Amino acid sequence: MAGGVTGGADGTWSDRFEQGLHPFIEVFNASIGFDLTLLQEDLDGSIAHARMLGSCGVISVEEAEQLVQGLETIRSEAHAGTFQPGLADEDVHFAVERRLIALLGPVGKKLHTGRSRNDQVGTDLRLWLRRRLDELEGDLQRLQRALVAQADLHRRTMIPGYTHLQRAQPLCLAHHLLAYVEMLERDRLRLHDVRSRVNICPLGAAALAGTPVPIDRQQTAKALGFDAIYANSLDAVSDRDFCVEFSAAASLVMAHLSRLAEEVIAWASEEFRFVRLSDRCATGSSLMPQKKNPDVPELVRGKCGRVFGHLQGLLTMIKGLPLAYNKDFQEDKEALFDAFRTTRDCIEAMAILFEEGLEFRTERLNTAVEQDFSNATDVADYLVAKGVPFREAYQLVGAVVRRCLDEGCLLRDLSLAAWQELHPAFEADLHDALAPQAVVAARRSEGGTGFDRVDEQLGRWLQHLNGTQPVG
């Protein structure tokens, strides 16, 4: 045919077409450059489909076994690097079918009986994403373990707590790190929840309306490990909600990683000096020899936008599509693949950073909490414990802070006599109550930063990540 190959396993769509594709359109239309990622899943789905055709009597059992052996041969060729699809194949499905026909002859042409690429690609995508979701859950737990290990080292290390990036109240460093462990646990559970909707099988929906071929959809779904089949064939081939859901869940993972990355970047700066970056996770400057740049967290923070962009792209792709399948769906794959790879890589990078790439400057951190007014709330709490109404105590302490700022001193610098001039409820135990260790230890409410509560939280997480008990 003139003008290039029109596609299909034998180089043609059908006798419906008299001319080949324009050479540019052939390239523009092809997805083989990226959907070959789905090869293993395509082979798995085709093997299950072939066996089902044989058991239902659509083809002979012998033919089904030939198809299975041919598909396994293609798998072996792929592992050996000898399976080389070309542009003429258009996509992974045609590439497999073309090679199968080359291996088996006419029997290879029977594989696609009772099936369309529409339900085939939906099945492949779900199989691929199901595996990737399982991997991401493990990756998140690795990062959680790294954070918990750091928290375990710093059960009694303190760090300034901030609101509005202003010093607020002192915290236990372990408590701060465990906040991210909690975020990541929500992410892990969210991804696990997405998996339940990924794990529904569209195979057998055919192009959009089902098939007159006497197939057994339940058999293929069970063989492939799906929990259920789509109840509506039109919905089965039209659904890309699971791609959007994954991208949304991945976006939240990235948002949490970006927040953690931003804190590491700040902590590593000369202005904070809370962490020291190792040479294995930092780079230098081509001009300024003194620099040690936090490239790892900066890249994580920067890559966050890629995953957010894929979510927006997928939402935009599906919003105006009529039922059922549309070529627009070809755009789901690169977005999905890159969202996964970016999220996975960023999780691993942050895990390495906390496993071996940074060291908390304990002395600096414990000193930092002594050099501010973050114990002001505790003065108010002290008065409340003595029977003073909170709002009265709050206003009094605010006036004291103003006085200290004017005089260039801290609350700890005021004498007991000066305190008692302000209110007779102040007693000799005040200064002990204002010490950072006492301030942190006093936060004993459940989930608080008090050392005893943090020990409880850490114990629960250590057991959970070792698989001995759930978090709760």
Swiss-Prot record:
Alphabetic keyword roster: Amino-acid biosynthesis, Arginine biosynthesis, Cytoplasm, Lyase
Keyword Lyase in record: yes
Keyword GTP-binding set for record: no
Residue ranges the record marks as coiled coil: none
Alphabetical GO biological process terms: arginine biosynthetic process via ornithine; L-arginine biosynthetic process
One cellular-component annotation, GO: cytosol
InterPro entries in alphabetical order: Arg_succ_lyase_C, Argininosuccinate_lyase, Fumarase/histidase_N, Fumarate_lyase_CS, Fumarate_lyase_fam, Fumarate_lyase_N, L-Aspartase-like
Protein name as catalogued: Argininosuccinate lyase
Reaction equation(s) it catalyzes: 2-(N(omega)-L-arginino)succinate = fumarate + L-arginine
PROSITE patterns associated with the record: FUMARATE_LYASES
Extent of the signal sequence: none
GO MF annotation: an example: argininosuccinate lyase activity
Annotated EC: 4.3.2.1
Pathway as given in its UniProt record: Amino-acid biosynthesis; L-arginine biosynthesis; L-arginine from L-ornithine and carbamoyl phosphate: step 3/3
Subcellular localization: Cytoplasm
Protein family per UniProt: Belongs to the lyase 1 family. Argininosuccinate lyase subfamily.
